[in-house]
């Protein structure tokens, strides 16, 4: 697959979820450090918010603990914030200081894109909020885009778990 040309339309991850909560509440869950710590990340992962600077150019820096003693780091660099309608950010794996790093998974053979642009929109109808996430690699090589496409199912599962946690968080 690394040698196959990957069309840009093929490299977009698109996930939509309807949540039983008003848009303002869902927006706060995406923009409040305490809330993010409770629902962001795959199921079974403990999130620690290291920094949340919610403004264009600001950073959300976090650690993910899968088990005691095994931490990974990630970050968002916000590009656009239009409350309560839209958030755009570049997501990357990071080191403890917030610098970009390669994905820490050997099976990805250092071919995971360093940066992904994510755009999340929030629309409300009848007291329920639809979140629509679209993500794609940026500044990526052909091989990195191919690896992104090859792992779409895993990303669907990972974001699905996060959005399940978000739905549960919103019931509290």
Kindly label every feature range from the protein language model.
Residues 5-8, 31-34, 50, 62-64, ...:
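Charge-dense, helix-prone N-terminal extensions
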Residues 10-16, 23, 59, 71-73, ...:
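Intrinsic-disorder/low-complexity, polar/charged segments enriched in Ser/Thr/Lys/Arg/Asp/Glu/Gln
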Residues 14, 34-77:
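Short beta-edge strand/loop motif at the mouth of beta-sheet-based domains
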Residues 17, 49-52, 74-80, 115-124:
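Hydrophobic/aromatic beta-strand elements that line small-molecule binding cavities or substrate pockets
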Residues 26, 36, 60, 78, ...:
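Hydrophobic pocket/interface hotspot
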